[in-house]
Amino acid sequence: DVQMIQSPSSLSASLGDIVTMTCQASQGTNINLNWFQQKPGKAPKLLIYGASILEAGVPSRFSGRRYGTDFTLTISSLEDEDMATYFCLQHSYLPYTFGGGTKLEKKR
């Protein structure tokens, strides 16, 4: 199975900050990767598909990049509404696999 190693598992940042999280695939090529945002009690929301394509309606402060088998999600100019858990999903190889998630919290 392709393991998706996501880091960091938690992240504390201030409003206006730029934050980046990473998913690394343990193997495989041409991996199709999505990024999701999930808030407590809510269904996951698709942010980015194809590693870097922004889903319609998602603010442009979100961006995704691919570096071989490494994938990043960056949020620029962090807003209150961005505090959530983020996770990646590879859907190129069965079984499809998720990263462990990154919980983003506001720095006190």
UniProtKB/Swiss-Prot annotation:
Report the CDD domains cross-referenced here: IgV_L_kappa
Instruction: Set out the biological process GO terms recorded for this chain's protein.
Output: adaptive immune response
Region (Complementarity-determining-1) residue ranges read: 24-34
Q: Which residues form a coiled coil?
A: none
Q: List the disulfide bonds.
A: 23-88
Location of region: Complementarity-determining-2:
50-56
Q: What else is known?
A: This chain was isolated from myeloma proteins that bind beta(2-1)-fructofuranosyl moieties (inulin).
Instruction: Cite the PANTHER family for this sequence.
Output: IMMUNOGLOBULIN LIGHT CHAIN
> What is the name of this protein?
Ig kappa chain V-V region EPC 109
UniProt source species: Mus musculus
